[in-house]
């Protein structure tokens, strides 16, 4: 692997001082085909020498690969310094895949329902280390990869520049060739970076992990609430929605904690006038501290949400890969 793997064609052309056409050919070889740099066709040796001189060799090694009974596949990958991250291949409609990528090794946010938070933060990933995760998965897949979600280990907006660089590489027509509208970047609510993201006008889908509309409840679940409280977060979401349209809000449902009528009412008040898509998902008991709602509790909460958020899409997310710790909130770099 090469550190320049994280560059899209335009960035590579600028950094290496080469033509955009040569950069596209190199990107097409290294990222589009997953081939060695020297396999790039119709590129002069002097240009390849220049690019190779700028590149620092790097490594991303597969440690383990486990298959869940529902078709999810979890990849445990080791970086050159020994740090480990995970990527998950998600089957869609028996025809294609979405890939969940990590932006950091571990996570500093310490959300109570997330196994990654219990690891602490080892370090942020470089752009090429993010892109290389997708290349590992793609090399192992017979179906096309048509979507990417930055919902693996880490907080993407605490590694903002590398995540955006990787995302643009993944949607480069010469590189990852993934429609930018099918790339989702999720944040636990780093308000200044949400505002920066909105101001910069990026084309990727923004998802915000909300999980409670009552401040003291959210604070107990997500320590980030201390630094970036709900009112500031919702203001940033409102600004983004005004410019880009509907924002996806993720909501981890925890039995007896955030699924009552008062929680639905608080959501209705908090999100009034903001076009959102609410994605509830049952908590996965990775930490042993929480349990998911049963069907009766979910049905009651769904009905309450429909009353409090009339006209807003409420789409329950499927939680796949649980038996192999590939599901949302379960990534902990375990080998089994």
UniProtKB/Swiss-Prot annotation:
One of its GO terms (cellular component) is cytoplasm. Binds 1 [4Fe-4S] cluster. The cluster is coordinated with 3 cysteines and an exchangeable S-adenosyl-L-methionine. This is Probable RNA methyltransferase Anae109_4379. Pfam families: Radical_SAM. Its cofactor is [4Fe-4S] cluster. [4Fe-4S] cluster binds at residues 107, 111, 114. One of its GO terms (biological process) is rRNA base methylation. It comes from the Bacteria.
């Amino acid at each position: 692997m090469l550190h320049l793997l994280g560059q899209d064609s335009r960035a590579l052309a600028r950094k290496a001082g080469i033509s955009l056409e040569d950069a596209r050919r190199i990107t097409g070889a290294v990222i589009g085909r997953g081939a060695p740099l020297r396999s790039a066709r119709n590129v002069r040796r002097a240009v390849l020498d220049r690019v190779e001189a700028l590149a620092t060799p790097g490594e991303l090694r597969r440690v383990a690969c486990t298959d869940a009974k529902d078709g999810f596949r979890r990849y445990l990958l080791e970086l050159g310094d020994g740090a480990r991250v995970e990527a998950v291949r998600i089957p869609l409609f028996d025809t294609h895949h979405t890939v969940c990528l990590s932006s950091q090794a571990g996570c500093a946010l310490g959300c109570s329902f997330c196994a990654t938070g219990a690891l602490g933060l080892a370090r942020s990933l470089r752009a090429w280390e993010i892109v290389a995760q997708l290349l590992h998965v793609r090399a192992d897949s017979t179906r096309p990869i048509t979507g990417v979600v930055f919902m693996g280990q880490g907080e993407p907006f605490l590694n903002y520049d590398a995540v955006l660089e990787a995302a643009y590489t993944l949607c480069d027509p010469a590189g990852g060739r993934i429609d930018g509208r099918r790339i989702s970047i999720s944040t636990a609510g780093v308000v200044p970076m949400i505002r920066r993201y909105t101001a910069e006008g990026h084309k990727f889908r923004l998802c915000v992990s909300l999980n409670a509309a009552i401040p003291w409840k959210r604070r107990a679940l997500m320590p980030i609430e201390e630094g970036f409280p709900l009112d500031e977060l919702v203001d940033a979401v409102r600004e983004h929605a005004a410019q880009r349209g509907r924002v996806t809000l993720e909501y981890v449902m925890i039995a007896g904690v955030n699924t009552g009528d008062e929680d639905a009412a608080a959501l209705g008040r908090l999100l009034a006038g903001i076009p959102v898509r609410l994605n509830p998902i049952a908590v996965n008991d990775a930490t042993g501290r929480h349990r998911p709602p049963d069907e009766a509790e979910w049905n009651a909460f769904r009905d309450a949400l429909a009353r409090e958020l009339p006209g807003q899409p409420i789409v329950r997310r499927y939680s796949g890969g649980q038996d192999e710790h590939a599901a949302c909130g379960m990534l902990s770099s375990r080998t089994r």
